[in-house]
Each structure stands twice: as C-alpha cells, then as structure tokens.
C-alpha cells in the first residue's frame, strides 16, 4: 500500500475494498466501467481510447474499488467527487445534465457519486453491501453531509422502461422541494400513458440507492453519450440505512 491508496475494510469472504487515486487501479476501474456500460447501454460512451471509459473528472475523484482477492480481478467500482475537488474541476459531473442551484444551498458538505458499476458475475448482495458499507465509512470519515449522483436507466426499448421506473420512483421516493433540480436535456415524453399498475423492474443499483435512503430530485434527463435516462438522486448521509451503518461501525471496532 502506498500514499495514494488507503484500505477501508477487512475482506468480506474473498472481497476487499480500497479507496485509491493510484493510476493503474483507476485504469482497471475504467476498463470495467467501459465493459459494463457499453454492454448495458449499447454505446461506445464517446470513448477516446478503445475499451476505456475515462473523463476529465476521474483525476479529481477518490475511486472506491472492490477486488476479488482469489483472482486479483477488480469486480466493482464507484467514484466520489468531494465539493472542494468539484470546484477545482469546474463543477460536479451532474451539472452537465441538471441545473443544481438548489443543491448548492444545502447546509453542509456535498459529494457526488458516479460511474458505479459491478461485474456481471458479482451482482449479488455481498458485493453490493460491501460497496455501500465502504462508501458509508468513507463519507463519514470525510464529514460529507449530502451525497448526490445520477441513477441511470437503459433506453433499449425506446424509453418505456425508463419512464415507468422514473414515475414509480417519483411516486415512492420523491425528494422535498428544497432538493428539486431541472434537467438540461429533458427525457422526451412518450406519446402514450405509462401504466402505473404493472410491476416495475427497478435496476439493482437503483434499489440499493433507495435502501440507503436516497431520494429522486425530479424529472429524468437524457444522456446522449451513454444513451440512457438519468435521474438525479440525493442522500442525506445522516439517514444511511441502519444495516449499512452497523456494518461499517462493526468493522471499525474490530
């Protein structure tokens, strides 16, 4: 371990999480991101280097990665952009999709979560729980009060699924007026009514956001690079779901 990398938790089963700014680990995360996002959204992501999902925000972020210690493979990743680093970067990533003035008025430190993905073979409760527990530990250690980020939904069916999920989340998990944002590129509305009676298949990562206590901040945005719909979500870090807070506090005591 070097000065660019800090271990956050003990291995859970065969998995380990670390927070890093180490270039080779960030590149491995960028390769996983490309694989997952290009397959799920059917887009080359506007990549300038084949097989790598990278942007100008990566160098300002802390990157949380999950590694399988049996194989050495990186199996999950997300990145966190703290408010102070966002100012150096010219703003948050999500400011390219939403008008965020309401969130800048929040009383406390804000950080942005982004590029969250999990290897298809590791999309289980253990991996996701470890990812969120490590994230909770990081946020508390950095005195972050609010977490924002984009929750993405694929558009392979032309938008019906995205609108059904968006409407469901707005009904069940809509944030208060003080958290509302406006999309810069609003997702085009369907020409027919979205049924509210049929079951809604919410993506696993978005379910995890809601379990953490996240809330949806308004209407969805269209992301042309990823060919997906994005919803801006906000999480009051003080309201982290109890099972995640207990998890990281237990690790601290060990």
What are these regions (language model features)?
Residues 1-10, 254:
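Basic/polar N-terminal segments that are highly enriched at the extreme N-terminus
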Residues 6-82:
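Short amphipathic alpha-helix that is part of the acyltransferase structural core
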Residues 53-55, 161-165, 231-235:
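Short low-complexity, flexible loop/linker segments enriched in glycine and/or proline
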Residues 61, 228-232:
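Short hydrophobic/aromatic beta-strand or adjacent loop that forms the aromatic wall/cage
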Residues 73, 126, 241-245:
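Short, conserved charged micro-motifs
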Residues 83-215, 220-228, 240:
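Acyl-donor binding region in acyl/amide transferases
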Residues 232-254:
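Long, continuous compositionally biased terminal/linker segments
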């Amino acid at each position: 371990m070097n000065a660019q990398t800090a271990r956050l938790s003990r291995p859970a089963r065969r998995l380990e999480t670390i927070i890093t700014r180490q270039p080779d680990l960030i590149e491995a995360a960028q390769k996983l991101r490309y694989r997952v996002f290009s397959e799920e959204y059917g887009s080359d992501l506007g990549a300038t280097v084949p097989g790598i999902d990278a942007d100008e925000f990566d160098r300002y972020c802390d990157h949380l990665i999950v590694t399988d210690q049996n194989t050495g493979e990186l199996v999950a990743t997300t990145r966190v952009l703290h408010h102070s680093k966002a100012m150096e970067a010219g703003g948050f990533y999500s400011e390219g999709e939403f008008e965020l003035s309401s969130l800048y008025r929040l009383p406390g430190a804000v950080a942005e979560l982004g590029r969250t993905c999990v290897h298809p073979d590791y999309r289980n409760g253990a991996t996701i729980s470890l990812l969120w527990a490590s994230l909770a530990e990081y946020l508390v250690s950095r005195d972050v009060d609010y977490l924002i980020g984009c929750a993405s939904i694929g558009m392979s069916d032309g938008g019906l699924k995205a609108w059904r999920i968006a409407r469901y989340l707005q009904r069940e998990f809509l944030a208060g007026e003080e958290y509302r944002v406006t999309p810069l590129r609003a997702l085009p509305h369907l020409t027919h009514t979205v049924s509210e009676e049929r079951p809604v298949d919410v993506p696993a990562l978005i379910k995890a956001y809601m379990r953490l206590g996240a809330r949806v901040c308004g209407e969805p945005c269209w992301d042309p690079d990823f060919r997906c719909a994005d919803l801006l979500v906000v999480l009051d870090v003080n309201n982290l779901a109890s099972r995640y807070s207990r998890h990281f506090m237990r690790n601290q005591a060990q």
